[in-house]
Amino acid sequence: LLVAGDGRAALRLGAGLHLPERPTPGLLAFLRARRPGALLSLAVHGRRGLFRGRALRADAVLISPIFATQSHPGARPLGPHGWAWLARNAGRPAVALGGVDGRSQGRVPAQAAGVAAVGWLGG
């Protein structure tokens, strides 16, 4: 279980933490100090995010959006090839996020460590 952006909630739940691409440094320090070894993931939307993921020593990156998504209607999709390039250069497990549903999941590159979804629950 990963909690998005709320270190205190992550601690209460004994969960890991998912940070936006531009995380709050104090939040990361809070989580690391209180719960060493807690799973940390970082949102990545482009090359800059890859550098941040390395600097933060994130356990995994959620690269998005791979496809058009209703949760971020103005975001330009990376597409499978753009997503795969970022994943190859991430240096850590990469999870596909954004527009993943029953129709698109088969187009997610095989190197994905997994898929994540905001609105899709398998239907």
Language-model region placement:
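Amphipathic, non-transmembrane alpha-helical secondary structure
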Residues: R8-L11, R47-F51, A55, P80, ...
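Structural motif
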Residues: R12-L13, L56, N89, A110-A113
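Catalytic beta/alpha-barrel core
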Residues: L1-G53, L62-S64, A96
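A short, structure-level motif marking secondary-structure boundaries and short turns
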Residues: R34-P36, A68-T69, N89-A90
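Short, conserved glycine- and acidic-residue-centered signature motifs
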Residues: A43, R76-G79
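Glycine-rich adenosine-cofactor-binding loop
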Residues: G79-G82, A87, G91-S104, V108, ...
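Glycine-rich phosphate-binding active-site loops on the catalytic face of alpha/beta enzymes
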Residues: G7, E21-L31, A60-G74, G99-G123
